Amino acid sequence: MKNKKILIISLCAVLIALGAAGSVMLKKNSISKHSLIYADVNDNLISYKISEKAKTRIFFDGYSEYLLVGKYIGGEYCCVSKGENSLYYDVLLIKNGNIEKTYQLSFCPDEIAATDGDIYCLTNGKIYRLSTADNTESLYKDNVYTHKYRLNMLITDKGDLVYLRQENDGSVSLVLDCDGQETDVFTFNPDDTIAVGLNTDNRFLYKDKSGNYKTMAVSVYGGKQQKYGKSATFVQASSDGKLAVKCKRQVLGECSDVYIVDGKTGIAVSTNLVDLDIPYSVVVV
């Protein structure tokens, strides 16, 4: 009987150990398949493989300058580029490592995000919508708050637009736009609140002076505000929601300290990524 108990205890210990090892392996695998895509200060398009801490340049035929990247619902990412000897800018929609479609722009935006139907371009406090049906540009929003943040226009994983709207009284509203139907999520004083970004389940993160600048979260689709993980000044989530990039500090739009965290729990899984010069426009694929 005693030997039987010892055998059962030993078997349980083995199963627990195997489960822990499997958990570690799963986390390692989920990290290894992700890369950061960004345009560096020399207008090169860079892929940074997280597990290997290695940078490689990405090239597409006919393009020599890569100026900006953004989220693309339906693919991996979108990129603003300039063709060789061209006076215009092109938006490249990238899927499975290749150019899926291209659209022409008359200007280079400050921020960009794309869905299957529309491409949103933010510049000088205005959002222009570029139709993927006929490649026409049209003014969509003209009251976007851009004085303090680099995260003024975001896209949820459902393809809906989220942006910061300037109000007449000086306050700023976080607005959800679903096919032209606007919903105010919440309004804040820009002198007291720091916008952070969208996390992996469509919660908008922010820090408020009244809460000692702890990171808070509110769902853009409705829900209670709540505390969220460790402090950060930027969040960019991967498309599958497993990882997020957080930059602890931002200086002139560039991240001076970058680390990778689990997108669901906020637990750091890779820190102190060296030799990175990542602008605010970074996409996790």
Locations of regions flagged by a protein language model:
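An edge-strand/N-cap motif at the start of beta-rich repeat modules
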Residues: 22-61
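A short beta-strand motif characteristic of beta-propeller blades
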Residues: 54-60, 98-104, 136-145, 181-187, ...
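Short beta-strand elements that form the blades of beta-propeller/WD-repeat-like
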Residues: 30-40, 73-82, 117-123, 159-165, ...
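Flexible "stalk/tail and boundary" regions
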Residues: 35, 44, 93-100, 114-119, ...
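Repeated scaffold domains used in trafficking and secretory/extracellular systems
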Residues: 63-73, 106-116, 146-157, 190-200, ...
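Intrinsically disordered, low-complexity segments enriched in Gly and acidic/Ser/Thr residues
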Residues: 193-194, 201-202, 206-261
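N-terminal Sec-pathway targeting helices
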Residues: 1-15
